[in-house]
Amino acid sequence: MPLDPTTMPYRPNVGVMAINRAGLVWIGRRVGSPNQDALRKSGARIDGWWQMPQGGIDKNEDPRAAALRELTEETGMRTAAIIAESSRWYTYDLPPDLLGKVLGGKYRGQSQKWFLLRFTGHDGEIDINPVDHDQEFDAWRWAPLDDVLAEIVPFKRDVYEQVIAEFRPLVVAG
């Protein structure tokens, strides 16, 4: 019997838009992204699904602390400061083929509080192969804000559009 997503909760989560001194946004290619050949055959002009760091909020954890923790766990970045927090929580639903298979199989999607952080360290600080955390990304790069949406995991694009619109005025070279 198929799962009924309307009976499932959203997972509390934080998302992080990390920008560097040049105002570029950090994005990582998801481990397990579709391979390049499959994407080319589908007509896509990208080499996998990319996204910004994000992750679950631990029990009794403050979302700001969760954002800094997730950034460090997934990217190795430690030299970053919070510039802004989203004005609201954004939600997305998982596509039917992932429902019951990801997020512990018990969530319909995620409810996310987003944070804009400025990375002031050097790129050598970035390490996507963590020792104490599952690897989320197999590649990373800094991208212009206007290029980010085209490469985002499709079911997250609506949230990304809204987050980018909210943070755009603050994404300036520093």
Annotate the PLM regions:
Residues 32, 49, 98-104, 145, ...:
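Functional cleft and adjacent loop/helix regions within the main domain
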Residues 145-174:
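Charged phosphate-binding loop/patch that engages nucleotide di/tri-phosphates or the phosphate backbone
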Residues 55-154:
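Unchanged
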Residues 2-52:
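N-terminal strand-loop-strand
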Residues 24, 67, 71, 80, ...:
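Generic alpha-helical hydrophobic packing signal
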Residues 21, 120, 165:
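Residue-level marker of positions within ordered structural domains that often coincide
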Residues 32-33, 41-43, 97-98, 130, ...:
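Short, glycine/charged-enriched secondary-structure capping and boundary segments
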